[in-house]
């Protein structure tokens, strides 16, 4: 594991080969860092230290429909042995959907400052949605569902929101229908191929990438 919060930004995604434009985090002791570990760390921070990383991992898994016995802080869905399993495929789909949502949100904005604010807003709403599932208020978080996507991006005040919702729904539905890791990467690459060059390689303030280990 690693001491302190693990943070990574920039570089290239090892699954898609595309530039990584957003910042990743993971709680102390994690051996992987990806969009899901970022949500786990954001969930811990949002709960002011009253929730452990393990509890946050279980909450994120439950909200996204993943097996709660899979520890997101050590499970690498891109590992050769894991990538061919049902859990590996499900975890990578969820990670890719989170990354795609946040990257498309950033791309709707004209400036880096606006992109940072938009990503932060959507991340906060996503964490609140995960907490609603943990509290029993709602049943699940579906990032390929237009009404849920619309609710998540409600705080984004500039850019073409209707197109953002449609593009995210289309991309994440394709990711959700993928039958293997390669298909997930292909769907994500198609969705993100036209990302603004001004955003590429710039660190923002929320989850992205789709499954790199802490040592990559």
Where are these regions (language model features)?
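Feature for extracytoplasmic/surface-facing segments of secreted or surface-associated proteins
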Residues: 1-216
